[in-house]
Amino acid sequence: MKLKSIMSQCQFIIGATSIKSLPDFSIPEVALAGRSNVGKSSLINAITNNRKNARISSKPGCTRQINFYLINKGLMVLVDLPGYGYSKADRATVNSYICLMEYYLLNRKNLSKVVLLIDAKVGFKEIDLDFIRWLEVHQILYQLVLTKIDRVQSNVLDVIVSDVQNFNLNFIIYPIINVSSKCKQGIEELIYEIAQCIKK
């Protein structure tokens, strides 16, 4: 099966807003996480080659539920987690979906890995490092993806990658992938890395 065809059939299943509404799948899941406005929705549309799959907003913090997408009629599930960081929602709402996200990550037995998106324009923020530390503490596998690389020079990317190598990380999956949803750069490599969960 060709890489692009793996992700070409993408069906939105449910937006879970509570623990009870989380769907029960036995197939592999890959979750996309990242700071608010890091480009998760754009990336989902890029890897599925459909601009309509995930709603894109210019306002950060709009995803307030866990969105589940069935890939290729049940080959796997792509999961869009709420963005952490800035949000216009009230504190109670933010705490609610953060708790839901933590519950999902800690209890999902069919979760293959978390794809953690980092905005290459700004690099690592403290909140990104806090999330990485949280994943490490709870021994959750994750892979880093640098987004919006069309807006930065290659030497900036080199610095970010160098920073990662200086961290003491035990549950990171390499390689670090550089992507641009706008230019479609790195998309095929990312699809390949996501598809590895199918082979396990």
From Swiss-Prot:
The keyword Nucleotidyltransferase does not apply. One of its GO terms (biological process) is division septum assembly. CDD domains: YihA_EngB. InterPro entries: G_ENGB_dom, GTP-bd, GTP-bd_ribosome_bio_YsxC, P-loop_NTPase. Its cofactor is Mg(2+). Mg(2+) binds at S41, T63. Residues 26-200 form the EngB-type G domain. It holds the Pfam family MMR_HSR1. Keywords: Cell cycle, Cell division, GTP-binding, Magnesium, Metal-binding, Nucleotide-binding, Septation. PROSITE patterns: G_ENGB (PS51706). Disulfide bonds: none annotated. GO terms for molecular function: GTP binding; metal ion binding. GTP binds at residues 34-41, 61-65, 80-83, 147-150, 179-181. Belongs to the TRAFAC class TrmE-Era-EngA-EngB-Septin-like GTPase superfamily. EngB GTPase family. Necessary for normal cell division and for the maintenance of normal septation. This is Probable GTP-binding protein EngB. The lineage of its organism: Bacteria, Pseudomonadati, Pseudomonadota, Alphaproteobacteria, Rickettsiales.
